[in-house]
Amino acid sequence: MATKASNDEAAAAAVATVAEKAPITAERKVRTDLETKLHNPYMPRALAAPDTENVNGTTRSVHKHQNMSVLQQHVAFFDQNNDGLRAMGFNVVSSFMFVIFIHGAMSYVTLPTWIPSPFFPIYIKNIHKAKHGSDSDTFDTEGRYIPSNFENLFSKYARTVPDKLSFWELWHMTEANRNALDVFGWIASKFEWGVLYVLAKDERGFLSKEAVRRCFDGSLFEYCAKMRSGGDVGKMD
């Protein structure tokens, strides 16, 4: 009997997500029900960005993966005709500043050669090399999307509304994700999430789970460009 109780205790400890002496593990809860809602939630996805509400990712009628990794899809919108930022509604000054920061920081690591380019191009084929630290780890180091890490963004930090993030919840998330001494990662993370918040927040000042998911696969940018041009985009909750 004692052996059975000991085995039960060991089994419970083996899957525990909270440690009593580490209160932060209780404060930032992780999802324990994902396997009942999403097939293989811990398996990195190369082509699609699913969540518990969209188990196959963004529908093909809205967004096509073109056999690119999810990280490649995330940046490909801006390579279509060199005016992606303008198509989303950012003015010339903002677009210029974004280009300086993004290309200045990420161009060299994606180049196919050791020789720098004065034009600061970003090669989508090598965009996985530009993954920085202090991020959400929703992308792995090869540019695949990890559904469980995406879901945990909201279980950990969405306190007001379960599937939305307020500005301060977003700020808290970027603070919590900081790696030691990673100054570039701290700045890059604040910049990226700040731009996303300005771009996609709703009328109540929340950033929805669906907007964040579609940012990861790049379909959010297509949605915003179509909406700005007066096209039929449907509803995105």
Regions found by a protein language model. Give the residues of each.
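Acidic, Asp/Glu-rich intrinsically disordered regulatory regions of eukaryotic Ca2+-responsive proteins
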Residues: 1-237
